[in-house]
C-alpha cells in the first residue's frame, strides 16, 4: 500500500518582509505537522525553516516601473512555470505572501486548476483601486488580513477574509522600556527626546527633511535640553539627509542612527514621521507622534482623487478617528508641526491619553498572527 503523501504547502514570497512572514508560518505549521513539505519561491529565512526553493526570492524583488519592464519577460516566464509545476504537484494549499501584482494572478491560475489558494497580507484595496477586491475574490479562497478594518472591507464584498492580527504587534512588548532604549542610544533619562523619521524612500527624505529639521530647531528654543534622534534606513538615505542638514540646520546637534528606528521610537517622548508602516511601529512603541507628509503637487492632486480613506496613518484608521495629528502638503510646515508636537513633548495629559489608546489598539491586533495563519492554512487543507 502506497505511503500517504505528506501535507504539501506551496508558497511564494517576493521580498524580505514576505520571507519573514513565510518563515513564521512554516515554523507554526511544522510544530503541528512535522512531516509537512514546503515548496515554492523562498528567501533565506524560509529556506532555513526547510522550504524547498524552486526560485530564489530575489528573482521577484523588483521595484519601480523601469525595473519591472526590464524584467517582465523573466517574471512572466517564472509565473507560467510555477503555474505548470504547482498544477502538477497539486499542493494542499497555495499561499501567496504579499507581492500582489505577481501572486494574485498566480492564485487565480491555480484556483482554476482546483488548487486552494490563500493571499497572505491584504493589498491596500480599502484605500485605493478598490475594484481590485473583485479580482482578489475570484483568485483566492481566503485573504489573511493584519488589521480589523481590512476584514470589514472584504466582508462588504463577500470575499472570505480572516483577521489574524499583526506580526509586528506580536513582536513588540505592550510596555516598552524607554530608559533601556535611551541607554542603548546614549540619551539621558531626564532629557526631552524627539525622533525624526523622514521616510525610507529618497523622494520622501528629499521632500520632508528640511521642514523636519526646522521643526526641531523651533522645538529646541522651547526645550533647550531636547535630544533629537534620526534613524535612517541605509547609508544612501543617511548621506542624503546629511547633505540637507548641512544646508538647512548645520548647527543643530542630532544623533544620526543607522537603522534602529524602533529603539529611537521607544526612547523618544514624541516622533515626527512620514506616514506608512513607521506610524504603526511608532504606535506599538507607545511613542506619541505627529504625521507630516508632502508630495509633488500633481501626485497629491491625484492621490486625493484615488484614496478613499479619511486618514492616511494606520493609527487613525485603527482608531476610526484623528488620534494622531496629520499635517499634509501645505500644512506640513515647521510652525504647524512644532505646534502639534509641543503638547506631546510636555509629557502631560495629551501624550498620556495617546499612549493609553496606543496600548488598547496594540492589544486589539496582538493575536499571535503566525498561529492564526497556520490555523487558516490547515482548515483550508482539510
From Swiss-Prot:
Pathway: Glycolipid biosynthesis; lipid IV(A) biosynthesis; lipid IV(A) from (3R)-3-hydroxytetradecanoyl-[acyl-carrier-protein] and UDP-N-acetyl-alpha-D-glucosamine: step 5/6. Keywords: Glycosyltransferase, Lipid A biosynthesis, Lipid biosynthesis, Lipid metabolism, Transferase. Pfam families: LpxB. The keyword Glycosyltransferase applies. The keyword Lipid metabolism applies. GO terms for cellular component: membrane. One of its GO terms (molecular function) is lipid-A-disaccharide synthase activity. It catalyses: 2-N,3-O-bis[(3R)-3-hydroxytetradecanoyl]-alpha-D-glucosaminyl 1-phosphate + UDP-2-N,3-O-bis[(3R)-3-hydroxytetradecanoyl]-alpha-D-glucosamine = lipid A disaccharide (E. coli) + UDP + H(+); a lipid X + a UDP-2-N,3-O-bis[(3R)-3-hydroxyacyl]-alpha-D-glucosamine = a lipid A disaccharide + UDP + H(+). Its EC number is 2.4.1.182. One of its GO terms (biological process) is lipid A biosynthetic process. It comes from the Bacteria. Belongs to the LpxB family. Condensation of UDP-2,3-diacylglucosamine and 2,3-diacylglucosamine-1-phosphate to form lipid A disaccharide, a precursor of lipid A, a phosphorylated glycolipid that anchors the lipopolysaccharide to the outer membrane of the cell. This is Lipid-A-disaccharide synthase. The gene is lpxB.
